[in-house]
A protein has these predicted regions:
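Structural beta-alpha unit
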Residues: 1-5, 46, 56-93, 100-101, ...
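Short boundary motifs at domain starts and secondary-structure transition points
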Residues: 1-4, 128-135
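Small/aliphatic-rich secondary-structure junction motif
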Residues: 2-53, 60-65, 138-192, 212-217, ...
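A conditional alpha-helix N-cap/helix-loop micro-motif detector
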Residues: 20, 74, 105, 149, ...
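Hydrophobic alpha-helical membrane-association signature
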Residues: 23, 50, 152, 203-206, ...
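Gly/Ser-rich helix-loop-strand patches that form or flank binding pockets
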Residues: 82-132, 237-289
């Protein structure tokens, strides 16, 4: 089974805004932690003034200059960033994001969230409470019953060790519909309770197997939680309630579009109201964009 780590090439989009310097410093810190090359993507015309300003900003980060590529692009921001990621074989794209989108921005989509919906490399969304500026203590990772989950959990463990995280919780969201319908009498209530108990036992055994596989990678202390609830919404609420520093989830099986926001996809619940920094893990670096 191929894994997307180690992250050898990371990228971030850089704009000349009040947040540019902070974004660059966050990205260079991550690049140094990973011993990775850094691609700085600027969507806009290349001018001597911009080149000079970028060179000054890079020099102030302390990163080795030969590990940084500045890539100027023209055109649509999202398309240009994704094309750069593909051409430069980026493993991890870093973007900043507001924790909560208003209704209009949710339906039209910010650039960061569009990248999450359309990207084909792993993506790290940094919120105002960044895992880089602050100590990373708790990581929550999706334990979905899906072929992608093992790699996602292993990636969370790999990145957690880089960040110096203290604990990982694998959260398995069980859709209540799979555990039986609402009971109308005592007999149905007992049958539903029994079905849910058996289902939880099966899921506990599956997650335990994941934990055993993590031991081979040298795992951070890990625990798991099985929760009956709406997928996406439940894990986001759990991460917020338990003050997680980083939430790690599977990538969507296909690019998300407007209909996924109208009829909410699992990931859209999290993107609409980020509980913390978010990493979306894509499985194969050969399909980057």
């Amino acid at each position: 089974m191929s894994v997307p780590f180690p992250f050898k090439t990371i990228a971030t989009a850089i704009a000349f805004s009040p947040y540019a310097e902070a974004n660059l410093h966050e990205s260079t810190r991550i690049a140094k932690m990973l011993d990775a090359n850094l691609v700085l993507i600027h969507v806009g015309a290349k001018t001597p003034e911009k080149v000079e300003q970028l060179e000054l900003m890079i020099s102030q980060t302390g990163i080795e200059r030969n590990k940084v590529l500045v890539d100027f692009r023209d055109g649509d921001a999202v398309k240009s960033i994704l094309e750069s990621c593909k051409e430069n074989k980026v493993n991890l794209l870093i973007a900043g994001a507001m924790k909560k989108e208003n209704l209009i921005r949710f339906y039209t989509g910010s650039i960061a969230r569009k990248l999450c919906r359309k990207g084909r490399c792993s993506i790290l969304l940094l919120t105002d409470r960044s895992v880089i500026r602050n100590k990373c203590r708790e990581i929550v990772v999706s334990g979905d019953n899906h072929d992608k989950t093992e790699v996602t959990v292993r990636t969370a463990n790999y990145f957690g060790k880089i960040l110096g995280a203290e604990h990982i919780t694998i959260v398995d969201e069980i859709d209540p519909k799979t555990g039986g319908n609402a009971a109308d009498d005592d007999a149905e209530l007992e049958a539903t309770a029994h079905k849910r108990k058996e289902l939880k036992k099966q899921e506990d055994e599956r997650i335990a197997q994941l934990e055993n596989k993590l031991e081979k990678d040298g795992s951070i202390p890990v625990g798991h939680k099985c929760i009956f609830g709406k997928p996406g919404y439940t894990i986001g609420h759990y991460a917020a309630a338990n003050k997680a520093d980083l939430l790690v989830m599977n990538s969507p099986d296909s690019s998300l579009g407007l209909m996924d926001r109208v009829f909410t996809h699992d990931l859209e619940y999290v993107l609409s109201d980020l509980p913390c920094c978010l990493m979306i893990v894509h499985q194969n670096e050969k399909t980057v964009a």
